[in-house]
């Protein structure tokens, strides 16, 4: 497979870099140059361009990214597809639920109560077809979730099907069944990223939501995993553990994690029954500022976890505001714009946090492309009136305001804090 894929979009294109699993947005003029570079050396493209100086400037910017071959051509191909007029050809990331069963009963889980009976899981053959369709849409980033994915007996075959299709899968697990042997198998699959959930730096905070003894079990499993497979520790920030995020970073370093991710608990699924776990906006911001203070970067506008060369992904409102405007039209929420989810039995939803009532249709009945383009819930979220709405998480808006058209209270507080003290606003890096 080529290192790069140029994915045509309504605004120009997105270039997917397989080496970093990142998308880079380009406008129409830059896209014209990129498409010419697929078959023609840079020197010739610049010479023939109507604005040689602009073309040369773009070429110079591409070089440090290692986008060009030694002969000056782009190190990639253009995806053969025609994008829609008002939304992405395909989501930047798709979260696929590969199993509904789980060994834990986490009280803050985004999923509906588990196990969920009556849902016939997608077969390996069906998943393979889905993965290939996602690749044809330029949707290369894949999250495999559950339930607990490690309980699926053919999981390694599922991962192989995903990588064979050209996707970059990330496997999210509670880590309970993570053996050295399994970690070694995952490590052999170069494109697989292991995402292990922890919800605190101590057994007291973690076990309070995941069950007695789970912290010690998972930490023990992870002590040798870093030598066998690259993994990230994913921390869910709640009102109970926000005070110990600095110790969470230290724990991630101690266990050899390659990345640490901090996200707030969302008011969805089982978490709807634990409203006391929801951090306030200010509590979450204090946690982010604590993480930012640990940064080795002199730029105070960015928050980094001091793990080897990796950036913290905070999922904060300001991070969404910084990135969403580049590639989507509308409110800036990722649901139906840059991400979506597929349930264990193939139901496609703009975001799993919205719950099953927002499932549009099943891939057993319609193609993923059709659902992404014209599913009723996708159309609903994309049609939100931008004159009366100013952004934020649709799941939080649904929980607090009773509608996806309501306003996310965190977005309101974020805008208020910017007006009151713009210099204190924390900007963070985000991986889409």
Tell what function each PLM region has:
Residues 1-114, 135, 410-414, 418, ...:
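N-terminal pre-core extensions flanking Radical SAM catalytic domains
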Residues 2-6, 192, 197-199, 204-334, ...:
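Radical SAM enzyme [4Fe-4S]-AdoMet core and its adjacent flexible, acidic
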Residues 57-61, 67-193:
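Conserved alpha-helical substructure of the radical SAM core
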Residues 72-90, 309-322, 359-380, 385:
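Short, charged low-complexity linear segments at domain edges
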Residues 101, 105, 109-112, 336, ...:
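Cys/His-rich metal-chelating microdomains
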Residues 101, 105, 329-332, 389-392:
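The −1 position to Zn-ligating cysteines in a subset of zinc-ribbon hairpins
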Residues 102, 171, 196, 346, ...:
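Conserved, mostly hydrophobic/aromatic
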Residues 347-432:
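Flexible mid-to-C-terminal extensions adjoining Fe-S/redox cofactors in radical SAM and related proteins
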């Amino acid at each position: 497979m080529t290192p790069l894929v140029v994915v045509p979009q309504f605004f120009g294109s997105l270039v997917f870099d397989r080496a970093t699993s990142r998308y880079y947005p380009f406008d129409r003029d830059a896209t014209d140059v990129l498409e010419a570079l697929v078959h023609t050396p840079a020197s010739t493209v610049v010479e023939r361009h109507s604005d040689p100086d602009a073309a040369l400037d773009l070429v110079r910017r591409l070089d440090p990214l290692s986008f060009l071959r030694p002969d000056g051509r782009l190190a990639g191909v253009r995806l053969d597809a025609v994008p829609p007029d008002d939304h992405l050809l395909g989501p930047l990331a798709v979260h696929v639920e590969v199993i509904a069963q789980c060994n834990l009963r986490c009280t803050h889980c985004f999923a509906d109560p588990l196990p969920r009976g009556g849902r016939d899981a997608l077969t390996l053959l069906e998943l393979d077809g889905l993965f290939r369709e996602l690749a044809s849409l330029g949707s290369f980033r894949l999250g495999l979730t559950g339930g607990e994915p490690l309980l699926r007996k053919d999981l390694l075959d599922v991962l192989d099907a995903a990588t064979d299709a050209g996707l970059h899968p990330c496997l999210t697990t509670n880590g309970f069944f993570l053996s050295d042997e399994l970690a070694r198998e995952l490590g052999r699959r170069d494109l697989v990223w292991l995402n292990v959930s922890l919800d605190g730096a101590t057994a007291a905070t973690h076990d309070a939501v995941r069950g007695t003894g789970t912290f010690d079990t998972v930490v023990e499993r992870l002590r040798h995993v870093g030598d066998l497979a690259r993994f990230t520790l994913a921390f869910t920030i709640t009102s109970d553990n926000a005070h110990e995020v600095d110790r969470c970073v230290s724990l991630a370093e101690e266990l050899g994690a390659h990345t640490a991710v901090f996200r707030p608990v969302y008011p969805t699924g089982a978490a709807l029954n634990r409203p006391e776990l929801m951090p306030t906006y200010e509590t979450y911001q204090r946690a982010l500022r604590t993480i930012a203070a640990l940064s080795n970067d002199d730029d105070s506008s960015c928050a980094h976890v001091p793990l080897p060369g990796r950036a913290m992904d905070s999922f904060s409102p300001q991070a969404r505001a910084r990135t969403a405007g580049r590639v989507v039209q509308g409110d800036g929420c990722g649901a139906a714009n840059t991400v979506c989810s597929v349930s264990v039995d193939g139901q496609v939803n703009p975001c799993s946090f919205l719950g099953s009532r927002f499932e549009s249709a099943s891939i057993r009945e319609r193609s993923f492309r059709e659902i992404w383009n014209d599913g009723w819930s996708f159309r609903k979220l994309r049609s939100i009136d931008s004159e009366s709405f100013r952004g934020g998480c649709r799941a939080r808006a649904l929980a607090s305001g009773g509608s996806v058209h309501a306003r996310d209270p965190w977005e309101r507080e974020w805008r208020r804090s910017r007006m009151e003290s713009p210099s204190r606003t924390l900007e963070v890096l985000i991986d889409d």
